[in-house]
Structure formats: C-alpha cells, structure tokens
Amino acid sequence: MNHLNKLMERLGHQFNNLELLKIALTHRSSGADNNERLEFLGDSVLGFIIASELYQRRPQAREGDLSRMRASMVNGDELAQMSIKLGINEYLQLGVGEQKSGGKRRRSILADALEAIVGAIYIDAGLETCRRCVLNWYGERVDDLSKLSPKKDAKSLLQEWLQARRLPLPTYEVKITGEAHAQTFTVNCYVKGLPHKTEGVNTTRRRAEQIAAKRFLELLDDGKGDGITERDQ
C-alpha cells in the first residue's frame, strides 16, 4: 500500500500522477525537485475558487469587501491550520536543517504545501475536481460565506484614519534577520508629524506590518483598535 494513500483519502483525490503529489510535499530545503512552482500555481487557483464562491454567494457585496473576505479565507494562518487538519505536515519532505528547526510546524511551510497541493490537483484532474476538493476542505466555512462579515485589516484602517484627517500615509521600515529558510521580519511603523512609532515582529512581512499598524492605531486612542484583524492582506 502506497504510504500516500491515507493522505489522498484525506484530500479527497486519488492522483493519477503520484509524482505531482510528491513534489507538492517537497520543500526547497530538501535539495530535490521542490514545490515552489506548484505553490505559485496553487495560490492563484485557490484564490480563484474562493473568489468565485464569494461572487456567487455574496451578490450584494462590494469589491473591497469581497477582497477582504477572500483574504480572510486564504491567509497564511488559515492555510497552515488547514494543512495540519488534513495531516499534510506528516508527509512533508524537508532538508535535515529544516527538520531540526521545526519546519513541519512552520506556518509558511505548511501554507505553501497546501497551495502546492491545490496546484497539483489542478494539473492532475482539472479545475472542477480541484474546486470540489477545496470546498470540501473548507467545509462549514463555505456555507458561512453568505454570512461572513468583512473586517478591514489594521493597515487599511490606519490609512483611512490618516486620510480622513489629511495626514501623511504611514511608513513601514522593514528589517530582516535570520537564515533564508527561517527569516524574522521586524517592521517599524511611523507617520511624519506624529510622535508615535510602533513595532511588529513576525515570520512574514505582511503580518509584521499588520501588527505594527494595529499597535499604532491603539496608540492613537481613538477607538480604532477594537475589532481589528492583524491577518495578512
């Protein structure tokens, strides 16, 4: 019995070309053919599937709201959690160094692998099969799309707050530390003419920027920190 059969059962798709699934599970640190190209494709396919569902289920929603709702469905945290739920982390092929540093628990690696699998299913069986698999993974989240309330991210709220007062837009200074496979992003957020300066630290630049923006809003003490999401945009 192929050791990937259990994973394919969880994914809801039996691959015709098993090599596609193997590549989708292979991180670049392993030194073999890796999943970066499949991830690139899967990112677009996944975004299209969710965007299409939102378009059908939320006919009254505006473009900006649709974009924010899609982002909440396909952000790194969401994809990493789904990757673990499907057991993808158990099958990842990593280099020795990446394994020792906890790569199978790393959010970005988990999210990238899920996107790569989406790309692999798309190549292996086409869009409709891929759509069926993706919507099945999301389960009740798909049914909730018609009720999903769009939240603006911290960067958008900060920009709107500043524009409403005719103030300069925020500046985000980024410092990157660590090895290429385990980078840490430190972002400082400030606005010319205002005394505040805040910092956000995370393993992705986008999330670090969101954290810094949220903290900046909280310093403004204008009620804008309530209900803000720091998710990637």
Curated annotation (Swiss-Prot):
Homodimer. Its main location: cytoplasm. Mg(2+) binds at E39, D112, E115. This is Ribonuclease 3. It catalyses: Endonucleolytic cleavage to 5'-phosphomonoester. The active site is at D43, E115. The keyword Membrane does not apply. Digests double-stranded RNA. Involved in the processing of primary rRNA transcript to yield the immediate precursors to the large and small rRNAs (23S and 16S). Processes some mRNAs, and tRNAs when they are encoded in the rRNA operon. Processes pre-crRNA and tracrRNA of type II CRISPR loci if present in the organism. It is an enzyme of class 3 (hydrolase). Transmembrane segments: none annotated. InterPro entries: dsRBD_dom (IPR014720), RNase_III (IPR011907), RNase_III_dom (IPR000999), RNase_III_sf (IPR036389). Residues 153-222 form the DRBM domain. SUPFAM superfamilies: dsRNA-binding domain-like, RNase III domain-like. The keyword Metal-binding applies. One of its GO terms (cellular component) is cytoplasm. Keywords: Cytoplasm, Endonuclease, Hydrolase, Magnesium, Metal-binding, mRNA processing, Nuclease, RNA-binding, rRNA processing, rRNA-binding, tRNA processing. SMART domains: DSRM (SM00358), RIBOc (SM00535). One of its GO terms (biological process) is tRNA processing. It comes from Coxiella burnetii (strain CbuK_Q154) (Coxiella burnetii (strain Q154)). Its EC number is 3.1.26.3. Belongs to the ribonuclease III family.
